[in-house]
């Protein structure tokens, strides 16, 4: 559990799921300004973390990944009674209107298209956290 040194509040736990190692660490640096960040390289690794007791406040996931993609992860979470309430932000290069609709229907609360600005991602994560409260 991480504590904000300025406010004394507990920082939210953010799970970032991304197969591109460079982008994964860049996203971690961005989101570390607002929360405690845990990383997974694909949907299977994320699901393993979640099923072994890790409880994030929000998940940020890429859509296209090996082993288990973000869409399958979102659908799996949505169908799981214990994990279905976790807010999910999709972060992906697939930015067409139908891609966004598919992501939202799969369980994502927000959709961020790559390339993206740090402020846009942080804004969507904050909105997902607020909606969860």
Tell me what each language-model feature is.
Residues 39-58:
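Acidic, metal-coordinating helix/loop segments flanking the phosphotransfer/catalytic sites
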